[in-house]
């Protein structure tokens, strides 16, 4: 007995030291966590204040705080209540019984020792601490859903009802997600309460669990029954919410509520609500009865009912009743799915028009569509990116991240151009130059941009550059007065500006040019307290120790376009491709942003996307020099955007106040267009019978690529639509029938005002064969002349590169096909545009330039305008020297017209020359 008592006493100092270390570690962890939270808060507050969105910051912080406190309080109260009840009831048991029951499973340790330890614990404080800690974890997770609850509170009506329950669609977009979160939290809180109480009962011996005995006291049964009843009550509500989730089901035929769901699934859910209510009442009744059988029966009632009513019966009903007459029974539900999917993605706004595919092109037609011809894109992304890198990166630390297609009015004409910003990547500096000063103080910004027309090339096959060099030189392109790029796609680290040393600006010969920042970007960091804050935030003591930082210095953070926009508006989904715009001598980034939801009723989810509703409601403009961010609301009819505008009334500006020059550069975003095009492959079919049988399913065209077969990507193009008076900027993509290669339609999105955002699909006659891109590629590969030339180049040590897309060019009611061909040395990295391949009708040609290709294409028999029959009735005369001279003169004039791009003049002179030559030929035969 003496040994058992004195042993622990001798170990007490060591145990106290261990406890002290544990407490110290916990205190340090808590302090470090609070410091990290405080630094994040202060940095965010400073940053939001500087860029002018302090109201957004406080609204977001306030919403997170309210959700956190509400969830923490509710969870803690529930856990505390159950913990204290368990403690109150458990103390009625004898301490000796408690000790014996617990320690019997641990090897029959002395029961008096456990009783001593248990009795010395301050259980109320321990329960309070445990409840608060568990609630903290739950609340921290739920605080991230602040946007869902704000949308619930500020929701805007959609203005249309779902056809099954007649609820406004806004209920599904804004209320249902909040209800599901609340339901899930209630289930979690009840489950944690049960575990929390069970732990207390176990320690106090109310629950016995060993190899000889498994039992629990009547008190535990009563408490557990009360919680089980609450769980069944929440489950009843969950089944009620499941009625609405039927609108998101997918049985393979239709997305949304099907015939089986409405006639079997919905009644089954009502029955499950009733059974769950009965189970809840039975569980609560067991608080007095205190038996195992009643809760077990309640649980089996719900479990078996759910399996039979929600699982087995619908499967049997679908298999033996619905499947034999599936189309007839599912017809109204297929029609709902078609209508609501088209509505969710704005597919119902696509205007369908016929395209005759007459193939009646002539020189006169080409001349009438000169803007289209002059903007056929011959420079593909990758070859042009390689060329830019070789010719214009100038130093290893400059990088062209991505090339973009845009349009500008240059020299009085509407031109499609490729443009890319010359950004700075300090990580590409030599290894011995990878210093903190270089990364954060000296090499702070990129410089200028490169721009080239999509069609023109030099005599060496290189792009003609409208913008080039450092500092930027404009040769036909827009002037850049402020070329420095502090914010872009490559910038992922902070920099210090307005320091004690000038920043590297650009290289000039053997020397460098330096400059000092003179803008408003960045957060002030001159004060010691702010230097300490950012040093802790970035875990970088150099910010505190560096002598380069002065009282006027500013630190630029979040310089990446995507990160910058997401930090301000995390509820917006961003397009993958922000693009550079030069306006009034300054450089801006234009970022498309989407409002999305995955709760639009009965709508097909987008492929590989967690959404079934999307709108391009917001355009974001970021100043490349100052980093200012402006959000412009494009779609005032979007209820999701309207809801966020209610939440953040000063975040969005009307699109009408966007500078007019920037408005001219908005374009239809490719990500949205792809989603819509993918869905339109099926959802252009509006008749339920046709949709069910997939009779008219479309797909994207195939084309050779990457050593195999790839899917054609959409492309931007300037062209004039049939019946329109002027050329416009479009995003377009051809379509082909499923498992076929002939073209069936082409989809286009208009990018210019006043018709921005309107989608048009031009459908070809089903009885007429129109070659698709893959078929034209096959014809190109079958051309002996082209194949021989490509083989010859490959044998001469050059690598032939085909264009990524064979461009389908609609002109009037005809289709022209164009693809470039590049040459690159076997071990070189400088592609040259060497040939242009053009196809029209049955003819395929390859020439050095587009003009020559079109000239050759339309001089083939059958492709030119037919010669007037009056030619044969002209009086016969002998060919003379004057006729030969006139024919030669006509030829020379035709060549001049061709070089100047005057297709109409070329056609006139060529036809006149042909008439002369035919006349001379006839008279020679007569002789």
Swiss-Prot record:
Keywords: Cell membrane, Membrane, Transmembrane, Transmembrane helix. The chain crosses the membrane at residues 17-37, 65-85, 134-154, 185-205, 220-240, 264-284, 297-317. It holds the Pfam family UPF0182. Its main location: membrane. It is found in: Cell membrane. GO terms for cellular component: plasma membrane. Belongs to the UPF0182 family. HAMAP family: UPF0182 (MF_01600). This is UPF0182 protein bll7333.
